[in-house]
Each structure stands twice: as C-alpha cells, then as structure tokens.
Amino acid sequence: MALLNVISENPLTLQPGQVIAFDHLANGEHWQWALGTVVSSDKHVVVVEQWAVNEGSCETLKHNISSEIQKEMKRMGVFQEQLSSARDKLAAIRSENEDRVSAARAVFEDAKARVASVDEVHMREVTSQACPSPVAVEVLKCVLALAQNDPTVTNCSTWDDIRMEYRRPNAIADFISADITGKTYPNAEEICSSLNEQRLSSLAASRDSEAISSLHHWVLSALAYQEAYCRLTTDTRVQEQNDAIANCIAGMKGCRLKVMKLKEELERGGTPTFGGQLTSFTKTSVQLKAPLSSVISIVGVDPSAQDCVLTDDEVGLILDKAEQTRLQINDHFSHLSNSYMEAMAELHCLSMYTSELEERRLNLQERFVFSLFTNAGKTNAPRRERIETDVGLRSVEAPRGDSANNIKDLQEIIKELSSHDERWMYRNEPTVTTKHRKSYPGREWSKVVERKPEELLSTFRTEQAAACHVPEDAIRNIEFTATSEKLQVSFDVQHPVKQTAAEINKRLQEFPSRGMDRMLCDVDQPKKGLDRAIVEVCRAFDLREHAFRGMTFDKFIEEVAMKGRVGDKDAYESEIGDLLMLLDKIHNENRSLQYTLEKSAEEFRRQTASTMREQESLRQRNGELHAEIGRLRDLVEKLRDLADNQASELELLKLQKTQANQIRAQRNLSTFRGDDTAEPVYCVTLDELREQTEHCDQVERELERQREQCQNLLNAQDDLLAELSGVSEEKEKLEAECERLEAELRQMEEKSRLSEQGLSEMTQRLEEKQAEIEGLLENLEQLDEQLEALRAAEKSAQAHIEARDREISDLQQRLEGEIDDHIKTTALLEELRKHYNNLEELFDKQEAELMAYREKRQNAHKVRSLEPTLRPIGTQTKPFQEVVSADEISSEPLLSVTLDEYNDHMHRSNQFQQENDLLRQQLQQANDERENLHDRLEQLMAENQSLSEQLHNMHEELEREERDRSGVTLQNERLAEEIQRKTAENEQLVLENNKSRSDIRNLNVQVQRLMEELELKAAENEKLAEELELKAAENEKLAEELELKAAENEKLAEALDLKAAENEKLAEELELKVAENEKLAEELELKVAENEKLAEELELKAAENEKLAEELELKAAENEKLAEELELKAAENEKLAEELELKAAENEKLAEALDLKAAENEKLAEELDLKAAENEKLAEELELKVAENEKLAEELELKAAENEKLAEELELKAAENEKLAEELELKAAENEKLAEELELKVAENEKLAEELELKAAENEKLAEELELKAAENEKLAEELELKAAENEKLAEELELKVAENEKLAEELELKAAENEKLAEELELKAAENEKLAEELELKAAENEKLAEELELKAAENEKLAEELELKAAENEKLAEELELKAAENEKLAEELELKAAENEKLAEELELKAAENEKLAEELELKAAENEKLAEELELKAAENEKLAEELELKAAENEKLAEELELKAAENEKLAEELELKAAENEKLAEELELKAAENEKLAEELELKAAENEKLAEELELKAAENEKLAEELELKAAENEKLAEELELKVAENEKLAEELELKVAENEKLAEELELKVAENKRLAEEVTQRLSEKELLAEDTSARLLEADSANSALQCKVKHLEEKLTLLSSEKETALATLEAEIVDLLTQLKGLNGTNSALESLCASKEKELVFLREHCELWTDPTTKKEKVITRHVKVFDGNEWMKLITDRPEALMSAFVIDAGNACHVPGDQIHEVSFLNNKEKH
C-alpha cells in the first residue's frame, strides 16, 4: 500500500491545443527541450505535434519576428486596457471608502461635540447614583471598553469600578478623545447588538438623561467610524485591484522587453537562431508521444499560430523550469526506488519466514514418519519431548513474567510521576470545596506574618495552587496562626469532584514548600509588592508604619478610611492608584530602556561580527591575490631568463657572423664555388688578425668618445626632466591656486548674491518706509545718494569680478594648450608601450632565427670538415637543436663567407658613410631642438611665475573688494538704523503724501532699471559662457596643431627608426633574411596601427562612459536643484498667501472703517485719502511680489479676465483645485501604499541587496585585480627597459670578449709571421672596413641611446598626460559648472520640459548602454545606483506631492480670500464709484493684478498637472523596477530553494547510502548466518537420512524375526493363536494410541512454535515498552513538580531566553497590570527552570503584532 501511495499521484491536466515545453532525450544521450502542441493526453502519456527550430532564410525569420511583434503589441494593448480599468475601479473603491469615512467622521465629531457640551455636574450626578438604570450602566461600560479597547470591561467590571473610572479628573474628555482608529475593537458587533435592543436603545438612553443619550450616540458613531476606517485597509477589493494592476504591469513589462529584443534583432538581422538572443520555431505535423512527467510548462503561444519567436529570457525561464522538473522527477524516482526496496525487503523477509515454516513442517513430518517405525521402547519419546517443551515454555515465560512485573512497576512510577507533572492544565469541571490544614516548622514565622503579610499570602496561595493543580483563586479563606515553633495554616481548596480530600491532602503533604522556605530565609529582605505599597502610602500620608503591621492591603485601606486622614475614600483610592500607576510607569520605562540597551548591544555585536567576517574575507582575498601575483611574477621571471638566454646566444651568433664577414673581406678571398641560389656556407678560418689590434684600439677610443657624448646627452636630458618635473609641480600648485581662487570667486559670487538679496530687501524696506515718510524729501535725496553710491560700488565690484573671470579664462586657455601638448606626447608614449608589448612575439621569432643560425653553424662545420684544403675545427659537433654555450662559440675560430660582391660592398659602405653624416646632422638638429625646448620650458616657467603673481594680485583685489563689501554692509546697517529712527517721525508727515508719490514712482523706475541691469548682467554671463566656448574651440585648434606637431615628431621618430633599421640592415646585409625581416616589420607596424586603433576606441569608450557618468551626476544635481527651487517657490507662495491673508484682514478692517465713517461726511475726504494711501500700499506690495515672481508673472499674463467674471472663474478654479487636491490625496495614498510595498519589497529583497553588494564587491575586487594586472604590465614594461639596459651591458661584455679576441689575435700574430706580406697588403682595406664597422657600431649605440631617450620622454609624457587629463577633467567640470550657472537663469517651465526630454534620452542611452555592457562588472554598481536614485526620487516625489497638495490648499484658500476681497472691493467700488473716479481706476488696477494672480494660479495648476504626469511616469518606472526586483528576488529564491533542495537531496542521498551500506552489511551477515544454518541443516538432513535407513533396516530385521517366530508359533502350538490374536488386538490399540499421540504431539509442537513466535514478539514489544517507559520516566522526572532547592553551592551561569505567548490583549495587561504580569511570569519561569524566582532577571515584555 505504501508503494501504491507513492506511485499514484495527481497527473497534470492539459487541454488539446495548448502549446507546451517538454523534455526529451536527444539521441539517447542528453536532455533537450522542445515545443509542442497538445493533441491528446491521458493519465501518463501526452501526444504532441512537435515544433522545430526555424532553419529557413533570414526573410522568413524577419517575417516571424514582425508577426511576433504585432502579437506582443496586441497583448500589451490588452494589458493596458486591463490596467486602466483596474485603476479606475481602484479609484472608485477608494473614493467610496473615503466618502464613507468622511461621513462617519462627521457624525463622530458631532457626537463628540455633543458629549463635550454635557455639564460635568450632570455627569457627576449620573455616576453618583447607587442604583442606576441598566441603560446607563451598559452605556458607561461600553464607553469605558471602547476607550480602553478592552472587551472584558463589559463583562467583568462592577458599578463601583465604573464609578472609580469616571470620577477621575477629565475622565470623559480622555474617553471621547481616545484614538478610535488606532486600535480596532474586537467585539463591536456585541456592543451594537446590545445597544440596539429595545431596553438599551437610543430612546431609552434619551429617557434616562442627556449625558447617557449623548454617550450612547457617541458609542454607536465611534463604532461606525471605526468600521468605516478599517474598511480602508481591509477592503479585499483594493487588494484584488492592486494584484490585477501588478499582473498587468508585469505582463506589460514582459511584452515590452520582448518587443525591444525583437526590434533589435529585426534591425540587426542575422541567422534563424541568434546565439542566445532569439529562437524561432515552426510548427510541424510530426507527432510524438511523451510522458506526462516530461512536460515543463505551458508556453503562452497562440495555438492557431504556425510560427513563434522566443527571447533568451523566455528560453532561460524554460530551462530553469526544466531543471526544476528534472530534479523533481529524480527526487520522485529516488522515493519510488526506496519504496520498491522496502517492499522487496519485506517480501524477502516473508519468503524467508515461509521457507522456515516449510522446513519446520517437513522436519515434523519426518519425525512423525520416523516415530511410526520405532519400537515400543521408544513410545515414551513424545512424553519426554512434551516435558522438555513444558520446561522450555516455563523458561520462556519466566522472563516474560519478570518483564511484566518490571513494566507494572514502571507504570506505577510513571503514574505517580504524571500525577506530579508540572505541565498540568486546569479544566473546567464540577468542583467541591474542602477544608485543609498545613503546618510549617520554624521559629520566625510570626516575624514573617508581621512584616510581609501580602507576600506570604501570595506565596502560600501560589504554592498550594501548584500542589493541588488548581488556579490560585481556588485557594480561599486562608488563616495564618504563627506559634513559637511552627506556622499553622488553615484554608479551603476548590477542586474537581473526581479528586477526593485525601488526594488533595496527599498532594499538599508531598509538594515541597520551596516558596515558604525562601520566605522564612529571606524574612529580613526588603519588602516588595503590596507590602511595599503600604509602607510608601504610610510615608506619603505621614502615618505610623507599626500601627499597620501584619495587615493586608484591604484591611489597611479600611483602617486608613476609618482613621479619617483622608475623608474621600474614592479620592484616596484614586491617589493610591495614581501612585501605583506612576510606579508601574517608572518600572515600564526602566524595562523599555533596558530592552533598548539590549537591542543596541545585540545590534552592535551583529555589526561587529559582520565587520569581522568581511575583514576575514578581505584578508583571504588579499592572500589569494598575493599568491597569484607571486606566481605570475615567477612565470615572468622564467620567461625573461629564457628570453635573455636566447637573445645573448643570438647576439653572439650575429656578432660572430659579422666579424667573419668583415675578416673574410679583409683577406680578399675568392668567391664561394657553389649554388648561387642558396646562401654560401662560411668555412674559412681567420687567423690573419694580427694587424687588427691597432684598429680595435682606435675603435675603442672612438666608442669611448661617443659614449661620453651620449652620457652628456643623457645628463642634459635628466636635467630637462628635472626641470619639467619642477615645472609640472609649479603647474600643479598654480592649478591648486586657481581652484582655490575659483572657490573664493564662487564664495564672492554667493556673497554678492546675498548682498543683492540684501539690497532687494533694503529697497523693499525703503519703499515701505517711504510710503509712510513720504514728506521727507531731503532724507529721500540722501537715501538716493546712498543708493547711487551702493550701485557704483556694486558696478565696480562686478567689473573687478568680470576682469578676474577674463583672466581666469585666459589662464584656463593656456593650461588647456599645455594639456593638449601633453596629450600628444601621451599618444606617442602609448605607441612605444604597445611596441614593448610586442617584444614577446619578437622573442619567439628570435628563437626561430637562433635555431636557423645553429643549423647553419653545424652545416658550416660539416662542409669545412669535407673540404681537403681547410683545417678542421677541433670541437665536436652537436645537433643544432641542443643549446651551445657562449664560451664555446667564442672559443671557436671565426668563419668568413664568400663575398663576390666585395666591390659593391665597398661602394655601399661609402653610401652608408654619407648617410651616417646626414644622421649626425639630424642628431645635431635634434640637440638644437632640445635646447629650444629647454628655452621654451624656461619661458613657460617665467609665464607661470607671472601668472602666480597675477593670481596673488587678484587675491589681494578680492580681499579689498571683500573689505569694500563689508563697508557697504555696515552702511546698509546704518541706513536701517536711520530708517528705524525716521519711523518715529511718520505721524507728522502724513500731509506730504502727494509730493512724495512722484519720488516713489521714480524710485520704482530706478528699481526696475536695477532689475534690467541685473538681466543685462545675466546676458553678460551668457556671453562669457559663449566666450568660454569660443576659447574651448581655440583650444581644440591648438590641440589639432599639437597633434600635427606630434605627427611631425612621429615622422622624426619613424625616420630614426628607419635609420636604425638601415643600420641593422648594414650589419645584417650579408644575410638572405632581409625580405623576411621587412615583412615582419610591416606586420608589426600593422599590429601597432591596429593596437593604436583599439586604444583609441577604448579611450573613446572610456570617455563616453565618463561622460555618461558625469551626465548622470549632473542630472542628479539638476534634479536636486529643481527640488530646492520648487521648495523655494512653495515657501514664496506660502509667504504670498500669508501676506494676502493679512491684506484680506486689512481690507475687512477697511470695509468696517468705511461703513463706520460713511455717516461722517466731513471726514469722508480724509478717510478716502487714507484708503487711497492704503490701496497704494497694497498696489506697491503687489508690484513687489510681482517683481519677486517675474517668471511666474510672465506665465500669468495669458488669462486676463473682466472684473465681473473673476469671481466665477475663481470659483471654478477653486472647484478644480479641490478636485486636484482630491486626486493628489488619492495619489498620495497610492504613493504611500507603494512606499509601504516598497519597504516590504526592500525587506524581502535585503538578501538580494546583500548578494548584489557581494557581487559589487566581487566586481570591485575584479576591477582592482585588473588594475593590479595593468600595474604589473607597466612593471613588465619597466622590466623590459631594464632588460634593454642589461642588453647594453651584454654589449659591453661583448666588447670585452672582443678585447679577449684581440688578445687571441696577438697570439695569432706570433703564429702568422709567415703571412706578413699578405697582412701588409690587406691592412689598408682592413682599416677601412674597421672604420666602417666602428661607425656602424657607433650609429647603433647612438640609435639605442636615442631610443632610450625616447622611452624616458615617453614616460615623462605619460606622467604629464595623466596630469593634463586630470586638469582637463577639472577644467571641463568648471566649464560645465559655468554652463549650469547660465542654464539656471532659464524659465522653470522650459527647464522642466528640457529635463523631461533629457531624462527620456538618458533613459534610452542607459538602456542601450546596459544592453551593450551587460557582462561588465560596472553594471551592478549602476543598477544599485539606479535603485538608490529611484528610492530617492520616490521620496522626493512624495515630498513634492505633499508640497503640491499644500500649495493647492493654500491656493484654494487664496482663491477664496481673493474672491471675498473681490466681492468687498466690488461693493466698495459701487459705493465709492460716484464719489471718487480715481479710486475706481486704482481698484481696476488692483483687479487686473488679481487677474494676474488668478492666471498664476492656473499656471500653477498646469504645473501640478505636469508634476502629476511625471509622478505617474515615475510610478510606472517604479513599478517596473519593483517588478524587476521581484523577478530577481523570485529567481534568487528559486535558486536558494534549488540549492536547499539539492543540499537536502545530497544529505538524503548520503544518509540513504549510509543506510544502504549498513543494510548491505547486515544482509551480508544474515547471508553468512543463513549459509551456516544451511550447512547445519544439510548435515542434520544427512544424519537423519542415515538414521532413517538404519531404522528401516532394523524394521526389516524385526519383521523377519516376527514372521519366523509366528511360523514357529503356528507350527509349534495352535494354542498360542488366541494369544497372538489377543496380542494383535493390543497392537492395533497401541498403534491407534500412537497415532493419536503423534497427532497430539504434532499439534502441541505447532502450538509451541506459535507460542514461541508470539512470545518473541511479546518480548520485543515489552522491551520497546520498557524503553519507552524508561524514557517517559526520565522525562517525567525532569518535569516533576516535587523538586527542591539545592542545598549545596554550585557554579551558576546566566543565559538569555525568549518565550512567546499568543493573544491579543497582552498590551492592556502590560499597561494596566505590569506587576501582576511580572510576578506571574517569574513564578512560572522559576518553576519551569527549577530555580528560585529571584534568579529570573532582566525580564522585558514586547508586544509585537499581538504576540508576546
């Protein structure tokens, strides 16, 4: 059955027509997935029509992709429609819920106001009633329960408790002001049903009293409000719509990604299967049968389609699901195999048992047959076997009886221990109360009763309740009687009826008195609990403590009330309750602080552990990196050694060949007679070197002279390098000084801006004060003069700033020119570095060349040995593959070649001499150019010095301007003081208003001029920015010129290289490998060009990435600035609203004053003048506001309306603003929910974030490794340079070898006395050849030195290039900052549009870059930055939404106030139109300004709409990002689950393997035992067969004897026949008896076997039962409640534990009864841990989601 349960599972249900992905074995070797359309399916098999991979043409594939794009676009449209409908439904549901909440809130507020209006005296009368009405009691209980959120109040509280609660001061106010929406009342339906009954209805409450009626209404409205509020968050319809929206967004995202990839592939084109991007399928008619378990998933493809295209994401998802399916199938197969093995094992056991029974049956049958033929003497065998069987049974039953007794004893012990199990639970059963007594020995019990009566009572009740397994309230009527020797206690116990009084007494006597003993031992310890409360109350009320000793708290309260110290018992109890609550509050605060400390310590420990782990991982990584670096260095060293060896051997061979050629030419030998097509073999010894010594000395002297010249050049170059480094340092200092000056300039600009703001504020103050002191013409003239002075100072400061800006721009241009120069030199250095990188390839070529030289040398030796006229060389020839030492080569005689072109060679030598002269001239020109460069450097240093002086002067000028500005600020302060002094004279100058109006208008004109000047300054700043751009263009031109210069330098370097190549050709001209070397050189040049192109492309890519990063940073900075500007605008709008409110209040006051003054005709003119002045002030203030908001004023000019329609338009706008505010509230709610969801997602994706951080850390490590690799490459380049120096040293060593050869030549001179004549004839030619060789060597040395100088220059240029790049980056940043400053002066709306367009472009660029750089390590950092930016943008957008909502509210209030002002102004205009036409004109102006404000509001509304659209876009992006994060989280979870499953499967496999190994061992042992038993059985069978044959033979003999005796008896005597008959009868009887005996014996044996088998099972069951009973016994002993305190001192340790209690009322218990909760928990914890309660420390309670 178990195997059947494992096999039978619910199969996957598929419908015909569905497209599925399924697994199959390709070629029977590996798994492969494919698509198929379901044709039919049954329980285990599915028939599909297979889809094949499209192998058609590109046109077909493009057609498939286009059709797939159309399908995905249709799906996206469906998703969009579903999304819009879901959003509409969600908005409707939320609107409905919010309307319900607002209505319920309005009713609740009315009820609250109604309750608040009830008189406190009336409420006191209600609560002072002794027998109130039921409706009053129920309503007061409901109010108390609802305010405290405690349902037990309605069931457990008495009228006295309710009176106590309502007599507290401000109790009603506290109750009705409770947070109803904060906590949901659990039993709201019960209250509603009870209060809606007829006897407790609102009518009954209104009949009772007004207070009860108002409270009744408050309770019902509060419950309705609570229900409506809870509906906001618990409405399942909202979650359904949110899920639908999330599904739609996810679907849209998938469609969008697929469409993007399809479009990319469609644009790119390609083969039918693009490696990893797309996979195209075509439906076929081939039908396959596949098992149902091989189905991976259902693919979302239209069944009617004939073609489909899947992206790599969809394919990856299918592959992941396929892997999961395979793992599940493997797991299921392992379960099946395990179940099969178990069934097979069980079947094998049954077969073994059956075979054993069969053997026993056969054995018994044989015994029965054998017994039939035994003699009569053996008839007692069954009886003997029966006796033996009985004895065996008794021996078997004996342990059974012993085990039964043991089990019985164990059961008795377990029963006894289970009766004392400390984990008992009380059950509600019928109870009975019995009287009991208990005594405790001790002499100090009277002291305990006197000092701690309450603690003694609680301890005794707790202990006896635990002993009797009843609650504490079941221990009643406790009476303590203390004597000199013991404490006698009598008490009642309410226990279940099934327990008798004797059992209770037994429990009481057996239970250890731990708590009472501790009380007796700790009698002198401080009091606690109610005992301590009694002492504190006595001290608080100045009562004597000894008068209340031995009293309980209840008696104490009664005694205190009787003493009359406190007349009002209720007040006294309330004060005591307040004191106790204060104590509990203090204790709770201490616990919370302790818990906070513990949490902080735990967090600190966790952070420390994580930091240590990170450090350890970093150490390990560093160790690995160091090991890898060491390994690479060793490898590089080996390669260098090999290259050095090969280079030295090659140089020796080249030198030997060159010398052989020269000496053969000197000897004027004949040409080689051989094949002209092949290179001749050099076979002639050169012992005629006697006269070469002088020439060699000359060569050495010439080399020494050239070496000194090169050393001088190197020293000069070092000096130039030192000067360049000094210049670069000075340049860095100058750049730092420039940066500091730029920072100071920015600070000065900020200060100037602040001063301009101060000036604007001062002008506003002046205008306000001038409106009040319009008569002071002389003072106004002075103020005008001061303003002119300020303007002049400002102009001068601005002129100085502009001059500085121009100087700085010039300095920047110069620096950029130098930067371009260094960039060009850097390019040359890069080329040289690439040349060094190709040296390894040259090493390989040199090795091939060396092998060729070795082969040529061996051939030369062979040919020389074959030549009869030549003397053979003494050295033994070796194979050319073996390495030949340099000493051996140098010791061999030199061999020359046959040169029939000797005359041509001489001619060429002369030509090369001329070319060398030209090279000397060019070298001299290069030295001259170097000197010119040195002079230019000195000029640059002088210019830098002058620039530093100019910067110093500019700094001094800035300081002077700063002092001037401080003086101006002091003057401004003085002006402010003078203005304050002049305000006192305002009252006397009211009559001179008309004169001062013209002056004010002039000032306004001047202010406008100042604003225009500021605009001109802004335009000038823009012009400066354009000039900077022009300068940048000039710098680019200079860069191009520098590039040309660099190209010339490159040409010169190429010329030098060509000359060096020519020199090398001159040295190696006799070789026939010139063509090959030229080809190799061309290939190297091509490689260099390719490397240069690659380097340029890499630089371009790096520049593009840097630009993108800078653009991202700039965009982030611009967004932050926009947010700050929006905040500033919001603040300005708020200020404007406040000022408009103030003006509205002033206008109301003005209207009242006009109404009052209307009756007074004489004062009408004066009042009108005052009103005109006030209106002028209002107009001026509005003009100032318009000046402050010029950008907004330009937008507000579009909607000018008439005075009569303004009110209607404002009302319409107010309605629109209200709608927008509601929409914003909805959006804010949605954003809040999205923020909550984001927080949840962030909480869920913390692991992903950590993994991403780990990945980012790994990528950073990889980047660092790459940097290390780059540094190592640079080190390799430096080492190559060192190797070049070493090669030079080897050249010197070669020169030494030449000297040694010269010594050998001298020895040869002694031997060459016979050839003196020939030597004399060849001396001249040898001298000429030696001169040519020396000149060639000098040229080669000069070229090498020039190459080294170029390398040094390249290194210097690299450094300078790096510095210049840094400076260029800084200059670019400065230019970008200037451009940003210029761009900030544009309009806000244009900026927003541009930012939106830029953001879209950046989004597209980022997507393209993300697609291109998916495999780069920087993508993770960008993704992390994008997530952080999105989170910041979400926060910013939420803040903007809140601010916009506030602005809308303010604008609505402004619109309402403006409408009221318009109505007032219209009334005033109608009244005063007839009297003053001028006043009407001024009011019209004011109305026009108000129209501008209305237009401004409309513009703000439009901006809000734009913001809302942006917020929606951001929300969509956020949803997309959230979906991506969810996808990543799901993938990570799947991977984690897969890893866990794999780990579990591995563990299971390991465990299964171990089990199988153990079972195999057991099986082997069993097989061995069975084999032994089988052998024994075979032996027994043989023995039995022998016995049977013996018995048969004995029976035959016996039969013969009996027949003979019968014959004798018959023949002897017939009388014996009767006896024979009688004996036969007896024999038959005996045989029958034997048969019956055998049958009974067989039955008894079978019974014995069955009994033995049953006894074996019983014994095993008894053994397992005994083991379980022993375990239970140990467990019960561990949890026995009869434990006692240890008498010996043991080592103690403190551990921290957490216990969770379920429930939803723990918070109330924590706040209301903390001490009771603490004491109960301490008692339970002490009993559970078997320790005293004083060892339970640092207990803290935490309410977390209604669990503790």
UniProtKB/Swiss-Prot annotation:
It is found in: Cell projection, Cilium, Flagellum. Residues 613-657, 684-864, 903-1663 form a coiled coil. Sequence repeats lie at residues 1012-1025, 1026-1039, 1040-1053, 1054-1067, 1068-1081, 1082-1095, 1096-1109, 1110-1123, 1124-1137, 1138-1151, 1152-1165, 1166-1179, 1180-1193, 1194-1207, 1208-1221, 1222-1235, 1236-1249, 1250-1263, 1264-1277, 1278-1291, 1292-1305, 1306-1319, 1320-1333, 1334-1347, 1348-1361, 1362-1375, 1376-1389, 1390-1403, 1404-1417, 1418-1431, 1432-1445, 1446-1459, 1460-1473, 1474-1487, 1488-1501, 1502-1515, 1516-1529, 1530-1543, 1544-1557, 1558-1571, 1572-1585. Residues 1012-1529 are annotated as: 41 X 14 AA tandem repeats of E-E-L-E-L-K-[VA]-A-E-N-E-K-L-A. It comes from the Eukaryota. Its main location: other. One of its GO terms (cellular component) is cytoskeleton. Disulfide bonds: none annotated. Pfam families: FAZ1_C (PF23404), FAZ1_cons (PF23398). The keyword Coiled coil applies. Keywords: Cell projection, Cilium, Coiled coil, Flagellum, Repeat. InterPro entries: FAZ1_C, FAZ1_cons. A component of FAZ filament that is required for correct FAZ assembly and attachment. Not essential for new flagellum growth. This is Flagellar attachment zone protein 1. The lineage of its organism: Eukaryota, Discoba, Euglenozoa, Kinetoplastea, Metakinetoplastina.
